[in-house]
Design a protein with these regions (language model features):
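Positively charged n-region of N-terminal signal peptides that target proteins for export
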Residues: 1-4
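C-terminal motif of bacterial Sec signal peptides marking the signal peptidase cleavage site
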Residues: 14-16
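Hydrophobic helical h-region of N-terminal Sec-dependent signal peptides
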Residues: 6-10
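Divalent cation-coordinating acidic motifs and surrounding scaffolds
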Residues: 18-353
Length: 353
């Protein structure tokens, strides 16, 4: 079985506008609004502000996180019960890709010395807010990463992607050691195009795989894919192939589900995270801005500010060991985490992330 190195990529998805939107920029999510996790979260998130175009300050967005490799039985149960379309990843005849990833990524990992970071953004019509939020949050996140790991020589890159028939399918920006260059590149992007719910994330991943990543076992490489829509059903194999390409490079995909994400979006995101050794992140209504965010079908999680969640995941990748958020950073929980675990109603325990 091959082993893969971890890389850092940030994906921001923007599904197209339609009459089903809850605001001028986002599709409707769960009509019930943010609530406890599917297995009984501790509290409900506040409903999102109806004015999703309101300007956010740095450190405003909130998010939870979940690790399907540490909780593989929950993941396989989820796939068996809730999967509209399973992702056909490549695998050896002796095992599935998911089983192989679980064996590789379930425990502690090797510490890394260097860091490559790519931001991949879906720039179709419905997530103009998320592009704006990313511009607001990015510099603070980059500064926090640089301050904690000054010797990691972090490099930043950007890939914008749209949908078939739009102005472009993917627009990559080369790696740079200066976060200000990436901030400037973000400023050139605008939301537009699309036309239906599904988009073309496979094109973003294909462009991601062509970036000039640093090689070596001491390089940490992650992927944060912020989106509110999955791939087109007829492009699922192409999506799986692109994720397999990222996996072969050692890219760890960290999806971040935005408002309007449906069940197939969660399936695609969690599958991409699990098979590459990333974790699943999801925006929540606790920020009070944007549209309604779907509560994921995961039983145990902490909600913190998004910038803290991203910084924590980078730290875990760089050090190779798990760390919980600081108690002061926890806004609420899904489930009742105690000593790093939640006890479910059926008597089993799961690990919090």
């Amino acid at each position: 079985m091959r082993t893969f190195l971890p890389f850092l990529v940030l994906f921001v998805g923007t599904a197209a506008c339609s009459a089903a939107q809850t605001s001028s920029t986002e599709f409707a999510g769960d009509p019930a609004g943010g609530g406890p996790g599917a297995f009984g979260g501790a509290s409900n998130g506040a409903n999102g502000d109806a004015d999703s175009g309101a300007l956010a300050q740095p450190g405003t967005l909130t998010a939870g996180a979940w690790d399907d490799n540490r909780n593989y039985d929950v993941f396989t149960d989820y796939l068996s019960k809730h999967v509209p379309q399973k992702i056909p990843f490549a695998h050896d005849p002796q095992t599935t890709a998911e089983d192989a990833a679980h064996l590789l990524f379930a425990g502690d990992r090797t510490a890394k010395a260097l860091l490559d970071v790519a931001i991949v953004i879906d720039t179709t019509g419905s997530m103009g807010d998320e592009i704006s939020y990313l511009r607001t949050e990015f510099q603070a996140i980059a500064s926090a990463v640089g301050a904690r790991f000054p010797g990691a020589q972090p490099r930043w890159s950007l890939v914008a992607y749209k949908d078939v028939g739009d102005e472009y399918l993917a627009k990559p920006f080369a790696f740079t050691a200066n976060p200000a260059d990436t901030q400037a590149a973000l400023g050139t992007l605008s939301a537009g195009g699309g036309g239906d719910y599904e988009e073309s994330p496979e094109e973003g991943f294909k462009a991601l795989n062509q970036l000039q990543w640093r090689s070596g076992a001491d390089v940490a490489k992650l992927a944060f894919w912020i989106a509110d829509a999955p791939q087109h059903p007829w492009r699922t194999q192409a999506f799986a192939d692109a994720i397999d390409g990222s996996r072969a490079l050692g890219v760890h995909v960290y999806p971040i589900a935005a408002s309007g994400a449906d069940e197939q979006t969660e399936v695609s995101m969690r599958s991409a995270a699990q098979v590459t050794g990333g974790r699943y992140l999801f925006l929540t209504d606790d920020s009070g801005i944007g549209g309604t965010h779907k509560e994921p079908l995961v039983p145990c999680f902490f909600v913190t500010k998004l910038d803290r969640a991203v910084a924590r995941t980078v730290a875990i990748e760089m050090t190779g060991t798990y760390e919980e958020p600081a108690p002061a950073d926890i806004i609420r929980t899904g489930g009742d985490p105690k000593n790093g675990r939640c006890l479910l109603g059926n008597g089993t325990q799961v690990d919090v992330f």
